């Protein structure tokens, strides 16, 4: 049996997928469920995996961006990322931690822990304040994605039985 076929391997796979930007828990939860994990345990693994990069992003992204900006190749890309984070940060600027939690809680592309952490870093929200807000947002988003995934599975199964 290959490692990725074991229960531990499936949990690690779910956490690893959730740690990837853009995919995050929106892709990790359906992947974990498809791999045979209990839906709510897949949700928990995805939330944990999605949280892993958050402290590093909040604490280090500005220093990394400042160093990369010194290279002509990276400067325009860094500027574009910062502009995007500031544009998406309007809700967070207005409502601070509640806005950050709500921003992360919406399971749509362009929202989530990675963008929420970038926004927190650029708005100088301290890690000790941002991490609980992002965690609550991920709990909400994870629950929504899990329920939507289960609903889609149920719908597909009912369509198969109708045919």
Give, region by region, the residue ranges found by the protein language model.
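Histidine-/acidic- and/or cysteine-rich, low-complexity loops and terminal segments associated
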Residues: 1-7
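Hydrophobic alpha-helical membrane segments of integral membrane proteins
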Residues: 7-51, 59-60, 90-146
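Membrane-water interface at transmembrane helix exits
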Residues: 33, 61-65, 69, 120, ...
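Helix-adjacent hinge/juxtasegments
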Residues: 52-92
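Hydrophobic transmembrane alpha-helix bundles
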Residues: 67, 79-86, 114, 129-141, ...
């Amino acid at each position: 049996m290959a490692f990725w076929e074991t229960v531990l391997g499936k949990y690690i796979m779910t956490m690893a997928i959730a740690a990837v930007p853009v995919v995050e828990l929106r892709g990790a939860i359906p992947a974990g469920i498809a791999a045979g994990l209990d839906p709510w345990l897949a949700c928990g693994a995805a939330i944990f995996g999605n949280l892993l990069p958050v402290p590093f992003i909040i604490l280090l992204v500005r220093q990394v961006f400042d160093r990369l900006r010194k290279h002509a190749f990276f400067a325009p890309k860094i500027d574009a990322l910062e502009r995007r984070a500031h544009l998406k940060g309007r809700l967070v600027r207005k409502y601070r931690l509640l806005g950050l939690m709500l921003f992360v809680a919406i399971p749509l592309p362009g929202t989530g822990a990675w963008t929420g952490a970038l926004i927190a870093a650029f708005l100088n929200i301290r890690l000790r304040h941002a991490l609980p807000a992002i965690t609550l947002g991920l709990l909400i988003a994870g629950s929504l994605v899990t329920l939507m995934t289960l609903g889609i599975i149920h719908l597909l199964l009912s369509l198969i039985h109708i045919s």
